[in-house]
């Protein structure tokens, strides 16, 4: 890449615009700044902001094929090499307010040894973590180091979220052991979170693995080693996701079985009640026909005797059901 000057990186509504000092710190990008491999410039933009969107479409620092990708069209994690630059799309857990974690945030990055251009719409907290390290002087020293720190933060957040989902599954399993059915929709949401996370983290693991294996000029051996460790850590998380998805399938079957058993018990109880009261209903209906007068209507104790007959009949049927082991 040709010389990258600070005056070409002046974007008024940029989220962040810093130059790494090569020692773990940073300075604001000035008009007179000149980016180098040891002191790359980092421009972090929200592609929905007007000035940022205009800069992305018009700057000569970006290849034509990168512009749309940085402007929000790229969603699935992937890596594309373009000459001396690399286009990378990554996904992360959404920790923004009023949003579910499974509604993943996206960070898109175009990198060279001298320039880092990253874009997002929703806030990516891993970016803020790297920024805090830079402010304290313990941040990345170059482009490769910066990318590794971003990948490390994204993977840490993913691992934490997987652990949270794992704890929820354990709670559901404990509830089912106590015959407690979870609220409607809870299992469906849990399965969706697992499946969505699996869908995007699998290609992201492949991106990390490729970054670790390719000889990118702005990544040194230490960066590649750390990236390989991150890829392996995410791979273990994917194995946990696969196991969790299988466990939720078993839980769904168990919940269906539990609800079916409850319905069968209710149906069985209603059937027994019908059997108990069917003879009494028959007798009361028969006496209610009233053809030629109701039997016993002239007897002062007729109604009492009839009620006692019904009680004896109900008890007899109940005794028979008990003896037949139906009750």
UniProtKB/Swiss-Prot annotation:
- Top-rank taxon: Bacteria
- Per the record, ranges on the Periplasmic side are 293-300
Q: Which reaction does it catalyse?
A: Zn(2+)(out) + H(+)(out) = Zn(2+)(in) + H(+)(in)
What parts of the sequence cross the membrane?
272-292, 301-321
Keyword Endoplasmic reticulum tagged: no
What is one Pfam family matched by this protein?
CorA
Q: What is its main location?
A: membrane
Q: Which residues lie on this side of the membrane: Cytoplasmic?
A: 1-271, 322-327
KW Ion transport (keyword) present: yes
Subcellular location field: Cell inner membrane
Any one Gene Ontology molecular-function term assigned to this protein's record: cobalt ion binding
Q: How does it sit in the membrane?
A: Multi-pass membrane protein
Q: Keywords on this record?
A: Cell inner membrane, Cell membrane, Ion transport, Membrane, Transmembrane, Transmembrane helix, Transport, Zinc
Q: Which GO terms describe its cellular component?
A: plasma membrane
Q: Function of this protein? A: Zinc transporter. Acts as a Zn(2+):proton symporter, which likely mediates zinc ion uptake.
Tell me which PANTHER family the record gives.
CORA FAMILY METAL ION TRANSPORTER (EUROFUNG) (PTHR46494), ZINC TRANSPORT PROTEIN ZNTB (PTHR46494:SF3)
Regarding protein family, the annotation reads:
Belongs to the CorA metal ion transporter (MIT) (TC 1.A.35) family.
Protein name per the record: Zinc transport protein ZntB
Give the organism, scientific name. Answer: Yersinia pestis
